[in-house]
């Protein structure tokens, strides 16, 4: 697709773009002038996790392309809870919890974007500023009358709950009105013309665009990104052990690096486009690496993603420590266990390896070790009890280091079949 706007062209070429309310008109506008756009985050936790990382990267690209991002922290809408993608009502948070979460999320966002008074500096705005002051009767007369309940019932966030006979509170039903109203407030206060969100927010975003039209405001635009899924179709952001937080105190930078180092081969190219700022020409070379060489691309992905989130020095230190596993460490003193190459090619489970090598007494104790994050291969934590070793884990070497806790280590040597 040929686009005039650098920003929209970037979203399209790097795989962010999903759909837009009026792409041709928005492209024309963004190619000519600085556009003010907003992305909202509700304050439901003390940090954002990597499920929000795609939106955060878009905030960065808005700035890099000369546009002005508004980050809307939903300390007002959090009091209600967004029903989108939820099977049940959210637990209502106390005012003090929302305040603490708001401060934590702000701290995370300030690592990624430049905030201030410059032309393309981000504005941090809080919707409680206007939502807390709303007069209910006036809101119903001036805003509520523009919404059709018939239409609202067709939105997935409502329809799916009702089809499953799951409770949808009147409180949550109002959420889409408040999100639409946020867009109107941001337009009138800051001349914001564009709202960006995940594809699950399409209905809410369109509501805001339509409300602006009915109120005879300048044309507003909505744009959505693809939902962040892995190659296996799983929603990204959480593992079996919990969320991958962007706050280094809640999820260590080293674990963050390892998370990206451990992604599936099929995800490497896409994640390089989404979560790094490497040129596309370089990414194309990296994603074409085959066999164990793909691990080099994974290391670059992990280091670049960690750099953006936690800073250059921390990322380089973690990458260097990982490199020392083979290139600097001497593993000659470790006990040795031999495995046949054919076993690895067939897929040797880590649980079985722990048991047959004598590192663990039984399969159940091996699984407990993995669930407790005590098992590492080449100092990378194994999180999946069903994980199977492949030749790629050997990174072109003749052995791997298998660790159980901090003190027990084994050198697993690849042996050719006779």
Swiss-Prot record:
Recorded hits in CDD domains, A to Z, give: S4, TyrRS_core
> Residue ranges of the S4 RNA-binding domain?
348-413
'HIGH' region (motif): residue ranges: 43-52
Task: Tell me which Pfam families the record gives.
Answer: tRNA-synt_1b (PF00579)
Does this UniProt record's set of keywords contain Protein biosynthesis?
yes
Listed A to Z, the keywords are: Aminoacyl-tRNA synthetase, ATP-binding, Cytoplasm, Ligase, Nucleotide-binding, Protein biosynthesis, RNA-binding
Residue ranges of the motif 'KMSKS' region: 235-239
GO BP annotations listed? tyrosyl-tRNA aminoacylation
Q: Name the positions where L-tyrosine binds.
A: 38, 175, 179
Q: What is its main location?
A: cytoplasm
Q: Which GO terms describe its molecular function?
A: ATP binding; RNA binding; tyrosine-tRNA ligase activity
| Main enzyme class | ligase
Q: Does the keyword Aminoacyl-tRNA synthetase apply?
A: yes
Recorded catalytic reaction(s): these are: tRNA(Tyr) + L-tyrosine + ATP = L-tyrosyl-tRNA(Tyr) + AMP + diphosphate + H(+)
An example GO CC term for this entry is: cytosol
Cross-referenced InterPro entries: aa-tRNA-synth_Ic (IPR002305), Rossmann-like_a/b/a_fold (IPR014729), S4_RNA-bd_sf (IPR036986), Tyr-tRNA-ligase (IPR002307), Tyr-tRNA-ligase_bac-type (IPR024088), Tyr-tRNA-ligase_bac_1 (IPR024107)
Instruction: Quote the subcellular location field of this record.
Output: Cytoplasm
Binding-site residues, ATP? 238
Q: What is its EC number?
A: 6.1.1.1
Q: Which family does it belong to?
A: Belongs to the class-I aminoacyl-tRNA synthetase family. TyrS type 1 subfamily.
How it assembles, according to the record, is: Homodimer.
**Function description:** Catalyzes the attachment of tyrosine to tRNA(Tyr) in a two-step reaction: tyrosine is first activated by ATP to form Tyr-AMP and then transferred to the acceptor end of tRNA(Tyr).
User: Which HAMAP family would you find in this protein's record?
Assistant: Tyr_tRNA_synth_type1
Name this protein carries in UniProt: Tyrosine--tRNA ligase
User: Taxonomy-wise, where does this protein's organism fall, top ranks first?
Assistant: Bacteria, Pseudomonadati, Pseudomonadota, Alphaproteobacteria, Rickettsiales
